[in-house]
Swiss-Prot record:
GO molecular function: folic acid binding
Domain of life: Bacteria
Ligand binding (folate): 28, 182
Record GO biological process: iron-sulfur cluster assembly; RNA modification; tRNA processing
Gene3D superfamilies for the chain: 2.40.30.160, 3.30.70.1630, Aminomethyltransferase beta-barrel domains
Protein name as annotated: tRNA-modifying protein YgfZ
InterPro entries from the UniProt entry: GcvT/YgfZ_C (IPR029043), tRNA-modifying_YgfZ (IPR023758), YgfZ/GcvT (IPR045179), YgfZ/GcvT_CS (IPR017703), YgfZ_barrel (IPR048451)
GO CC terms in record: cytoplasm
Keywords of the record: Cytoplasm, Folate-binding, tRNA processing
Main localization category: cytoplasm
Taxonomic classification: Bacteria, Pseudomonadati, Pseudomonadota, Gammaproteobacteria, Vibrionales
Function of the molecule: Folate-binding protein involved in regulating the level of ATP-DnaA and in the modification of some tRNAs. It is probably a key factor in regulatory networks that act via tRNA modification, such as initiation of chromosomal replication.
Location of the protein in the cell: Cytoplasm
Amino acid sequence: MMSTLFPKLSIKKEDTLPALAISELNDWALITMIGNDKKSYLQGQVTADVVTLPQDDITFGGHCDAKGKLWSIFQLFNHNDGYALFQRRSAIETELTEIKKYSVFSKVDIAVGDDVLLGISGKKATDWVNKHTTTDANVRACELGTFAKISETQWLLVTTPEHKKNIINQESNTVLCDESLWSLHTIQHGLPQLDNALSNAHIPQAMNLQAVGGISFAKGCYTGQETVARAKYRGINKRAMYLLSGQSNSIPVAGDAIERSVGENWRKGGTIVSAYRFEDGYTLALAILPNDLEEGTQFKLQDSIWNKGNQPYSLDEE
């Protein structure tokens, strides 16, 4: 059922995006982690370097199985007296089970948070956050809750139902819309995310986690590290996440298969990670594809031809 407070925003390809918009992020959730052993426990589980993460900063990270396949992709930051791992809700149940698997041996409490998650997006998002905070850090605790910078045009606010109500009442001149606009910003910035349809299927480098600072190759051991390291030093990874564009009749969803041209034929070429469809049918998507594609390779989805674009970052590892 569509929210009347946060309605879908009708946008065409040529339209200018709202300079400031607020969305409730119902398709996202937090896993929270508190307790004396939270830092050491998480350090041994994920690709990011938790030990060196500053109190007021945020980092991408991934949680893998022993073979290096991802259970989750998250953005990690300090929240209240512990950690928050911001990730897709569809994969949260599986991830909670996996991340808690060895917690019985540590003083750590892991749960799915019940906070309200608001997404502040647009070129004026940082200006809006600045009005409510007193620092210029990437993570800011304030009266409203915790702000975390997701990208140059996206801020997450972890807050309460009461603060959400007050914000809606006070922001009469701000665009309130559903979270599809948030998804568009995420895709434009090339940010990886992992829904349940992609769970336990890909290694971190196949989803560009190294390109967004989500893998530390200097930290100690963690689950799946051997595979992740071999992908870097021995070149065993054969996939990466790319931006695609084309026409669609309906919005593609995570896990949808894409075909690619091979000579005069078509064969399975990749998998959708996330997508946004404009009102005129023009669609942007992030997709996992082979990383050795020939120049000019075309793609097909929903019987339409799609083309590969450029990501806003380099995929080359140092």
